[in-house]
Amino acid sequence: MNTVTIKLKKVPDLYLECESVAPDKFAGKSLEEIAALPCSEGKRNYTLGDWFEISGAAGATADETTIDVYGPGTSKCTYFGAWMTAGELVVHGHADMFTVAWMEGGQLNVRVAFRHFAG
C-alpha cells in the first residue's frame, strides 16, 4: 500500500470543498498531478497544491492508495473521500460535512471526531 500525506497549510475562512481528496482520484498520479487536482472555497477555485503540502506516492490503483490528512483546519474541509470505491482515507483531525459521502468501498479512519453530516 502506498501512502500520500497531505497537510493543510492554513485554516480556510470558508468551507474548503475537497472532493478530489480520495484514493480513486489520487491513484496512478504523480505528486504534481495530485497537487493540480481541483478544490474550491466559496466561489473561488483552487488546486490542492494551493492548500495542502503533499508528499509520498500514490498507488497504481485506488485499492493500493492510502491518504493521510493532517492539519488544524480539517474541520473546515468537506467531501473528503466522497465517491471513493477503494483504498483508505485517514483523517488526523476533525472530519466534517459529507466526508465519504456516496462511498462505495474502501476504509475511513478518523483519528479525532466527525462533525456535521458525515457519512
Question: Model-derived features: where do they sit?
Answer:
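Charge-rich, low-hydrophobicity low-complexity segments
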Residues: 1-119
